[in-house]
Design a protein with these regions (language model features):
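Basic, Lys/Arg-enriched alpha-helical interface segments
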Residues: 1-58, 63, 71-77, 85-88
Length: 88
């Protein structure tokens, strides 16, 4: 099981998602899968990022609600969540 680390940006992003009426249970479900190193179902379109986000991964909680994270040996860092326009 990986140690969970949340960045300040991620925590702020979650508050914004709640204000937007997003179903946070969807985010929690993905986090639970990632923490136990379980592969995400294909519908989440999990993939590596390039450019400024090299070394990180992104998955789609919903078509325009993304999660950016980084997996280390013993931890997983949740860096950002939001829409494409919020993050890129």
């Amino acid at each position: 099981m990986l140690k969970l680390i949340y960045t300040k940006s991620f925590e702020k992003d979650v508050k914004i998602a709640i204000k937007r009426g997003k179903n946070i249970e969807k985010l929690k479900k993905i986090i639970e899968l990632l923490v136990i190193k379980s592969p995400l179902p294909v519908k989440y379109r999990d993939h590596n990022l390039i450019g400024n986000f090299v070394g990180r991964r992104e998955c789609h909680i919903e078509p325009d609600w993304l999660l950016i994270y980084k997996i280390n040996e013993d931890s997983i860092i949740f860096e950002r969540t939001g829409t494409h326009s919020d993050l890129f």
